[in-house]
């Protein structure tokens, strides 16, 4: 034997006029004996030659091993029909052509399977006579293009082992239904034209890249009876261990449209599970998975930093269109309304936070002091009281603050901005709280009342300070002299005696004072006003 060569150089078949390579020239699978056949086969048809060769091979194997083919696993070469140099010369052109077609068909069926792992294949003849079972195991190396006359077996990708079997089965009826995947052979001229046209490999349905050179193949999955029924179980006589016997599903059945041979493949060394609902689109930067490619593309914009949607008013950019739609600060639109108090919000998230006021729910608790909050942001802000962290710094005077809002309010001192204006007297204020306090002057309202003496106050802070009179509590102590005060502001004024600080300056004469009340009293000298 020496005709079929499956190894580093793939499948080699001679042209119709060339004799096959000798056994000594064949590389690949070991353990195959070589012989010389009678010199002439004249008068025999090609079918007779094939049948006689098969019979001779079975008898020889049975004699050597004491059993028929079921003794152990066989290789492709063990079951191949091969001829010596003398035998090949005796074949006429029609017989040689038929032989090449048969061998090429078997090779096509092989490369259609996952040849990187061990495969168990059963081939059945549709003639109903002399059904043969063929078992093959091994790894097939496929690479360079090989020509057989005008037909070219172009480069087949090595990643055949990346096949992912995804079949749908109807277990209720156990029938088979036809699914077609057409891959036609190309002539040398067609292959040459496509190469220069820059055609890329066609992505095979099973997950591996192929050039369009495969024959027309019919793929079946269980839904109807077509041809001979292929057994699901693997015979124990094929030396397969219990750990290797896995389910015949997923299975592959391949048939050429000109023959009714079926190949059944069961992966013995590697299970491959296909989850139809698993998230198959994955982003390398973050490892995040998505159900669809469109979601993946949206997520990729975050990594690319691409913000395609821009506000025409302020120029702010957004990753997605829906974020731009939620950007309603310019329109003043507040589509979300609280059912309890009727207050409106521009974002649904703000409404959800607001609802906690009505429910009284405060799920966020400080581990240091046990104080609870209705928002996580408020808890994070509160933590800075314990840590002393002040991450917000004024660029003008380097003063630091624990809250961003405090920094923004402080900046108005440097800019002179007073955005809050009284509608009655047009007086402006830096803080909205100051405007609220000022408005009470015009209304005369004093909503805060002391329960001890009945005195009323414009501001709640004034009421708190007043209550100290009744309790006699003096919580604020000077670290320099030990003097205590009932108000924090009084302690602050007292400290200036130790530091010598006089922050209040008269714009008329430049005189400085350590208290604001002293500066106001001094102003009356210039204006002539009497208290």
Curated annotation (Swiss-Prot):
Residues 74-146 form the KRAB domain. A zinc finger (C2H2-type) spans 281-303, 309-330, 336-358, 364-386, 392-414, 420-442, 448-470, 476-498, 504-526. One of its GO terms (cellular component) is nucleus. One of its GO terms (molecular function) is DNA-binding transcription factor activity, RNA polymerase II-specific. InterPro entries: KRAB, KRAB_dom_sf, Znf_C2H2_sf, Znf_C2H2_type. Pfam families: KRAB, zf-C2H2. One of its GO terms (biological process) is regulation of transcription by RNA polymerase II. PROSITE patterns: KRAB, ZINC_FINGER_C2H2_1, ZINC_FINGER_C2H2_2. SMART domains: KRAB (SM00349), ZnF_C2H2 (SM00355). Residues 1-42 are annotated as: Disordered. The keyword rRNA-binding does not apply. There is a cross-link at residue 271 (Glycyl lysine isopeptide (Lys-Gly) (interchain with G-Cter in SUMO2)). It is found in: Nucleus. Residues 22-36 have a biased composition (Polar residues). Keywords: DNA-binding, Isopeptide bond, Metal-binding, Nucleus, Repeat, Transcription, Transcription regulation, Ubl conjugation, Zinc, Zinc-finger. Belongs to the krueppel C2H2-type zinc-finger protein family. May be involved in transcriptional regulation. This is Zinc finger protein 701. The gene is ZNF701.
């Amino acid at each position: 034997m020496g005709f079929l060569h499956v190894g580093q150089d793939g499948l080699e078949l001679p042209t119709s006029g060339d004799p096959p390579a000798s056994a000594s020239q064949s590389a690949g699978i070991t353990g195959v004996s070589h012989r010389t056949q009678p010199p002439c086969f004249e008068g025999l048809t090609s079918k007779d030659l094939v049948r006689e060769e098969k019979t001779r091979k079975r008898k020889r194997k049975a004699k050597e091993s004491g059993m028929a083919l079921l003794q152990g696993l066989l290789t492709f070469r063990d079951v191949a029909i091969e001829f010596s140099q003398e035998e090949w010369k005796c074949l006429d052109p029609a017989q040689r052509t038929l032989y090449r077609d048969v061998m090429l068909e078997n090779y096509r069926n092989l490369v259609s399977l996952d040849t990187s792992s061990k495969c168990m294949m059963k081939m059945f003849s549709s003639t109903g006579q002399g059904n043969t079972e063929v078992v093959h195991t091994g790894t097939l190396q496929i690479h360079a293009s090989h020509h057989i006359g005008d037909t070219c077996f172009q480069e087949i990708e090595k990643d055949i082992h990346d096949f992912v079997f995804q079949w749908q089965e109807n277990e209720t009826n156990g029938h088979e239904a036809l699914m077609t995947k057409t891959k036609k052979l190309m002539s040398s001229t067609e292959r040459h034209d496509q190469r220069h046209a820059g055609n890329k490999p066609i992505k095979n349905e099973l997950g591996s890249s192929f050039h369009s050179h495969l024959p027309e193949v019919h793929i079946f999955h269980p839904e109807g009876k077509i041809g001979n029924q292929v057994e699901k179980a693997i015979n124990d006589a094929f030396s397969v261990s219990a750990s290797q016997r896995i389910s015949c599903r997923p299975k592959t059945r391949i048939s050429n449209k000109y023959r009714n041979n079926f190949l059944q493949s069961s992966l013995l060394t590697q299970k491959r599970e296909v989850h139809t609902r698993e998230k198959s689109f994955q982003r390398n930067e973050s490892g995040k998975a998505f159900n669809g490619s469109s979601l993946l593309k949206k997520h990729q914009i975050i990594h690319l930093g691409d913000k395609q949607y821009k506000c025409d008013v302020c120029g702010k950019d957004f990753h997605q269109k829906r974020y731009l739609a939620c950007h309603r600060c310019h329109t003043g639109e507040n589509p979300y309304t609280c059912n309890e108090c009727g207050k409106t919000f521009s974002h649904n998230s703000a409404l959800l936070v607001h609802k906690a006021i009505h429910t009284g729910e405060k799920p966020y608790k400080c581990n240091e002091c046990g104080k609870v909050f209705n928002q996580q942001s408020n808890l994070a802000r509160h933590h800075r009281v314990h840590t002393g962290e002040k991450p917000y710094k004024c660029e003008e005077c380097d003063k630091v603050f624990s809250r961003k809002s405090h920094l923004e309010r402080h900046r108005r001192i440097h800019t002179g901005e007073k955005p809050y204006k009284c509608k009655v007297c047009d007086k402006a204020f830096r803080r909205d709280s100051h405007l609220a306090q000022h408005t009470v002057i015009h209304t005369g309202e004093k909503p805060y009342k002391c329960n001890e003496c009945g005195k009323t106050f414009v501001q709640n802070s004034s009421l708190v300070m007043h209550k100290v009179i009744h309790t006699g509590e003096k919580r604020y102590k000077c670290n320099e002299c030990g003097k205590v005060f009932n108000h924090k502001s009084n302690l602050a004024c007292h400290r200036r005696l130790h530091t010598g600080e006089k922050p209040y300056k008269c714009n008329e004469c430049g005189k400085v004072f350590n208290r604001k009340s002293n500066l106001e009293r001094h102003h009356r000298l210039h204006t002539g006003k009497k208290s």
